């Protein structure tokens, strides 16, 4: 007998795991809108309080992938997603979105999966629109952008239509739930290389192991120890890496790469327009904390994408991509191509 919603809720209250096949069934009921908003809210809150297991998260991600509108990308050699869970409360400018242009200019293919702001001042979709990028493209058009420009942006609501059954519940609850954790695990192009920023150190090990179970090849999950869901200049960064089937955890420090330790206060923004202006400043080569933070994160992404042999080598490629103007040119190409394909 499949698990009932009431049984699943009881498990969470008793701090017991919902097993893989049970979680598949439960998640399909949620995605199909078969549960009432009250029951959905109770279960996802119960999971959060209990703490979701890697098995529960992996099963939920499998169902979200099953229900998603895919983007088919034939050339997957250096295909990478640069994504954050959000929820770090830092209200920084869109570092991973900026790093995407830099990584693409240095040779990665970026399939960026993102949405509007939930907890920050500016989500990736918000800043992309502020930059003039058309974010509502058909899957075939996104695949062409990846092939021709090296970047494709997948606006999450367009690829996860079943999430409409959960969206009102998430909004009303206003707290982090399993769905914050699932975003980086449900890239519609199923990129084999991933850089994920997370909002809590416990998620480093969870995300890297979930991505391993979901078939990823080279993954770096990062948590800035100052609370940032990015590789940070303000503190050490905890890294969980999956490479050649092996998982390792270690810290990296700005000084390891010749970067100055600096507070993230200078990276804070209040609107998508401010985020856009800071992002453009970085791509135009303005020196400072924003430039160095983006170079570090693009360097990690280039290492994850197997374009660079190490984070340090990736950082050097990132700096060169900005200095040459190639990163800014990528942005201009993406604006033009998305409008041509719209």
From Swiss-Prot:
Question: What catalytic reaction does the record list?
Answer: N-(5-phospho-beta-D-ribosyl)anthranilate + diphosphate = 5-phospho-alpha-D-ribose 1-diphosphate + anthranilate
Q: Where does Mg(2+) 1 bind?
A: 96, 230
Annotated pathway, please? Answer: Amino-acid biosynthesis; L-tryptophan biosynthesis; L-tryptophan from chorismate: step 2/5
Q: Which cofactor does it need?
A: Mg(2+)
GO terms in the biological process aspect are: L-tryptophan biosynthetic process
How does the cofactor attach, per the note? Binds 2 magnesium ions per monomer.
> InterPro entries of this UniProt entry?
Anthranilate_Pribosyl_Tfrase (IPR005940), Glycosyl_Trfase_fam3 (IPR000312), Glycosyl_Trfase_fam3_N_dom (IPR017459), Glycosyl_Trfase_fam3_N_dom_sf (IPR036320), Nuc_phospho_transferase (IPR035902)
Q: Where does anthranilate 2 bind?
A: 170
Tell me where the signal peptide lies.
none
Binding of 5-phospho-alpha-D-ribose 1-diphosphate, residues:
84, 87-88, 92, 94-97, 112-120, 124
**Cellular component aspect of the GO annotation:** cytosol
Q: Which controlled-vocabulary keywords does the entry list?
A: Amino-acid biosynthesis, Aromatic amino acid biosynthesis, Glycosyltransferase, Magnesium, Metal-binding, Transferase, Tryptophan biosynthesis
Q: Does the keyword Cell inner membrane apply?
A: no
EC number assigned by the record = 2.4.2.18
**Record: residues binding Mg(2+) 2:** 229-230
User: Where, in this chain's numbering, is anthranilate 1 bound?
Assistant: 84
Q: Which GO terms describe its molecular function?
A: anthranilate phosphoribosyltransferase activity; magnesium ion binding
The similarity annotation says: Belongs to the anthranilate phosphoribosyltransferase family.
Job description of the protein: Catalyzes the transfer of the phosphoribosyl group of 5-phosphorylribose-1-pyrophosphate (PRPP) to anthranilate to yield N-(5'-phosphoribosyl)-anthranilate (PRA).
> How does the annotation summarize its subunit structure?
Homodimer.
Protein's UniProt name: Anthranilate phosphoribosyltransferase
Q: Which gene encodes it?
A: trpD
């Amino acid at each position: 007998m499949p698990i009932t919603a009431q049984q699943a809720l009881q498990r969470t209250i008793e701090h017991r795991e919902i097993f893989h096949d049970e979680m598949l069934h439960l998640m399909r009921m949620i995605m199909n809108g078969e549960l009432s908003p009250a029951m959905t809210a109770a279960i996802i809150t119960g999971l959060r309080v209990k703490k979701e297991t890697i098995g529960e998260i992996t099963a939920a991600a499998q169902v979200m992938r099953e229900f998603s509108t895919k983007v088919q990308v034939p050339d997957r050699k250096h295909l990478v997603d640069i994504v954050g869970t959000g929820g770090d409360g830092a209200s920084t400018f869109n570092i991973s979105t900026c790093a995407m242009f830099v990584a693409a200019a240095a040779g990665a293919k970026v399939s960026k999966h993102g949405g509007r702001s939930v907890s920050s001042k500016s989500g990736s979709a918000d800043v992309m629109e502020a930059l003039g990028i058309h974010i509502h493209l058909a899957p075939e058009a996104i695949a062409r952008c990846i092939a021709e420009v090296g970047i494709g942006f997948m606006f999450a609501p367009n690829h996860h239509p079943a999430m409409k059954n959960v969206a009102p519940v998430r909004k009303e609850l206003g707290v982090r739930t399993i769905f914050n954790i699932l975003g980086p695990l449900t890239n519609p192009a199923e990129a084999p290389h991933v850089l994920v920023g997370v909002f809590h150190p416990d998620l480093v090990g969870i995300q890297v192991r979930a991505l391993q179970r979901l078939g990823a090849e080279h993954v770096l999950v990062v948590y800035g120890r100052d609370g940032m869901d990015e590789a940070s200049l303000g503190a050490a960064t905890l890294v969980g890496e999956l490479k050649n089937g092996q998982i390792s955890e270690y810290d990296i420090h700005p000084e390891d790469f010749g970067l100055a330790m600096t507070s993230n206060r200078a990276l804070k923004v209040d609107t998508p327009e401010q985020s856009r202006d800071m992002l453009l400043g970085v791509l135009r080569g303005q020196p400072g904390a924003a430039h160095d933070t983006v170079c570090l994160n693009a360097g990690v992404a280039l290492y994850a994408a197997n374009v660079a042999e190490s984070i340090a080598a990736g950082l050097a490629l990132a700096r060169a991509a900005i200095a040459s103007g190639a990163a800014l040119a990528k942005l201009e190409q993406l604006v033009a191509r998305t409008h041509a394909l719209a």
